[in-house]
Amino acid sequence: RIPTIMPGMSKNEQLELACIYSIAGKLGGRPDMSVRPFRAPHHSITSAALIGGGRLVEPGEVSLASKGVLFLDELTRFDTRVVEQLREPLESGRIVINRITGSCELPADFMLATAINPCACGFYPDRTRCRCTTWDVNKHYGRISRPILDRIDISISLQRVSFDELIGKNVASEGIKGERRMDEKTGAGGRRKADENAGKRTDEDGDMQTVIGNFDSSNMRKIVERVWRVQQERLGEGRYNSRMTNDEIKKY
């Protein structure tokens, strides 16, 4: 869902991405450069395929995902040495590949999204089904180094949903109804406060629209577009809050 709420790409971003795909020989398989890329490599991927490399240097997944999303499912199943290669691009948005014949610098400005199970069997902390020891669980999470964790801004823990819950009711709908009931109880003052916290304007013409209970992709994208426009006005095209310097953080 992440790519569906991200704003369209600027002309400069499209041109940069087209160059990357052209070098990789994949331009024909991606005719629409206005849509941000979403790359989800298999956990068996090598360092060269992820970062880029080869005798004749070719862009890796980090460059093919530039200006879009790189999704690593089951992060703990990836080779630890491969994951560690993400430090540089996550920090700088670029990747430098060194060869005997010289060095090559490629764009690698992507959003990293990952998913992991709570343990090797996937049932922790349900001790009626999980057979992993505390040592096993710690070892499972220990495959992700502290430097990589430091580069991840948001971490969300999800509880297992039973099969009966999945087929018996729409969990999202129930949550939305609950928010609306709470909104009715808080009254007008509560609604004004919720509007301020959630984001007031979502339409291009500046019309006021409450977004609580309406978090579909199209509505969320309008909010993101509005926020990105503010960032572009402050920092310039192609730079967002994640690339702010210390001085810029203090200023804004």
Outline where the language-model segments fall.
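Conserved RecA-like P-loop NTPase ATPase core
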Residues: 2, 14-17, 50, 65, ...
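Conserved alpha-helical scaffold flanking the Walker A/P-loop in AAA+ ATPase domains
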Residues: 31-32, 37, 48-70
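Basic, amphipathic alpha-helical bundle interface domains used for macromolecular binding and assembly
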Residues: 57, 80-252
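Conserved Walker B
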Residues: 68, 74-78
